[in-house]
Every structure is written in structure tokens, then in C-alpha cells.
């Protein structure tokens, strides 16, 4: 992964195409870069309100990444705003702002808003990026996320991940427990429920286009259905009735196929389904439990976990089921592997036992089983941490985290995100308990 953001703080401050080819996972932490997101200029009161809200979202996006430190507007010296003037760079350097964002919002006759921004390097006194967006009022948050994505990409060299969605399972705290599929922005905003809570639902997954989701619903104890829901129209249809399915399918990069695990005759195996013909093809053989399949970004490989050797471990096979190779060799049980969109790492859940009982861990390992450096790295641990999934740029991992009940408080489950390096762990706020997160690709 490119590492240009860590070079910004060097003595010869520079935001250019210079970049390291890979990030050092063991030593990936750096001080966040100070950035000033200035008040957006506006041509009327409606545009002013919109600009104010957008500045807050942009600043929050950059702060949540852990790579930027937005400077409080209370310390700003220069009073000019907008994109029509060249900043007084000395005034921004005086408050230690390495980067400056200026912008403006104008309301158009169509009712839409034209949003423009410029990213400045205050030390080199040069423009680094700029763009104009035309957006309807109801999509102002997406416009703010897109601006933050542009800033993130210009400084880090990696694509941003702010204009994305999270689908997850929401669970009420009161009895009886009600589980519903919910959808929200990556930062927890715009939460809405997609199912009514009348049946048990599990493991929502995005289709490759991110405008559809699939999830498992237990219509009855014996009948398990996989549903497809169109997020644009709200229409829902049954993909299939799969007795013994344990998780919703994961989709191939081309969107034509999906893999799932199904229990039959005492064993659980990996199956691939052709979404056009609905034809199933069994990929694993023998006895045991084979679950949680996930495609590689190029669709040529599948990672999954299996207890074929007594303890659940991680395996990789070709997408046709051939050339099976074990890739995990540490102590403990492995589960829920998820292949990074970059193709370099696989995230997983690992359960270890000690004197204090079980400990759940989220870790990453190199995806190449022949790599001598295929050592795993645990990035977070807890009473219950599970279901890792990746940001579209492979920089951040989102997961579910749980706490046990105590005399002072009931148990709870929430969604957290953490940097690939194991730093910057933070909670994604949800209205109720939450589990089984799935991260969309960047929205169109």
C-alpha cells in the first residue's frame, strides 16, 4: 500500500507522486496530518447551511481515517473563504495547517447545488486537487463523502472509502429479540431498516453492484430461504430454498456466481451457484465442516475454513475446487475468512483458549500460501470479535464486537472499524445492537 501520507510530515514537506510501494504492517502508525477545512462560501442561506453541514462531514471523514487531524475553526486567522482567491498561506502555516480545503456552494435554478472545492498545500503554496460536483439537496452527504475521498486519494495514493454503505443485522435489546437487516452510511448516518423483524435474518451480503443485497431468512425452523433485495426499488425475491445453508452467499467479482456452505448428510460443504441458471456445483469433498467461502478479487481462488484435520483452519482452493492448500498453522480455531479487495491479505476470526477462557481475535495473513512471510498478525482481541469485512481500498477492517452481561449492564454487540495496522479502532454508532457487517464498494 502506498504510504505517502507519512512523508508529509518530513522536513521537506511534499505532497507529490512520491510513495512507498508497501505499508509496513508492523510499523504503520504515524502522526495524523493537520488539515484545515475552511468554511464553504455560499450565495444564499440554503447554500450556507448545506456548506456548513458538508464541512462537518468532510472533517469527520478525514478524522475517522486516523490519517488527518482537522484543525478547529476557532483557531483560523484568515477570514476569506471560497475558491476565487489565493489563500494567505503564512496565516495557515501559523496554525500548523499543512493542508487547506476551501470550497463554495451555489444553488442552481434547477434546485440542485453546485459544490466546488480546492485542496491546497500550504508549505509549497500550490493547489493539489480541485473538483466541481452538481448534486440534489438530498445527496449532500454523498457529495461531502466524495470530496473527502478525493482528498484522501490525493494525499495517500489509495482510493477513498467514505462514499460507501454498510449493511448489517440490527438486534433489539429487549426480549423477545428482534433481528432486522439494516443499511447505513459507512459512518453510521442515514440508518434505515430493510426487513420487518418477523423472521430471523442473518449475514446480509452486497451484490457486486452494491444496489442489491442478499441475506438468509429462517422462514421456519426447517425452511431457510436466501432473499435478494433491490435497494433502489425495495422489491424482494427468493433466490432459493436451501435447507442447511449457514451463511448468505458471497459473490464472484463478475457477479455471475456465488459460493455458500450447505449442510447435508452430516457434513457441510462449499457449493457454487450459477445465478442465471440457479444450478449448484459442489466444490469440496469428504467428511467435516467446510464453511465461510470468500472469492479472491480476481475470482480465481476461494478461501474457506474447514475442520477436516480436527480443528477449523483456513484453506485456499481454485474456484473449481482443485488444488486445495492449507494456509493457517497457528494454535486455535479459525473462522470467517474474508479476502482483501487488494488481493494481498485475508482477514479472519481466530478463537484461542487460555486460563481465562476463550478469547476472540481478528487477524490478517498473507494470501499467498507459498510466501515465507505468511505469518499472521492479530490486530484486535476481545470477549467476542468476529465477522471481519474490508473497506473497498483494503485499508480498513470492520467487525462485530460483543461484551458479556454483568451485574451492572446487559451484554451488547456493536460494530467497530480498525486500520489494517491494528491502530485507530473506533465504534460505528448504530441505534441498537449490531452484528454481521458487510461493506459495499464505492457508490457510483
Swiss-Prot record:
GO biological process, one term: protein import
Protein location: Periplasm
Entries under Pfam families matching the protein: PD40, TolB_N
Major location category of this protein: periplasm
InterPro entries named among the record's database cross-references: 6-blade_b-propeller_TolB-like, PD40, Tol-Pal_TolB, TolB_N
GO cellular component: periplasmic space
SUPFAM superfamilies from the UniProt entry: TolB, N-terminal domain, Tricorn protease N-terminal domain
Cell cycle recorded as keyword: yes
Keyword terms, alphabetized: Cell cycle, Cell division, Periplasm, Signal
Cleaved signal peptide residues: 1-19
Highest taxon in the source lineage: Bacteria
HAMAP family named in the record: TolB (MF_00671)
Similarity field: Belongs to the TolB family.
Its biological purpose: Part of the Tol-Pal system, which plays a role in outer membrane invagination during cell division and is important for maintaining outer membrane integrity.
Stored PANTHER family: PROTEIN TOLB, PROTEIN TOLB HOMOLOG
Protein name per Swiss-Prot or TrEMBL: Tol-Pal system protein TolB
Species in which this protein is naturally found: Rickettsia africae (strain ESF-5)
Gene: tolB
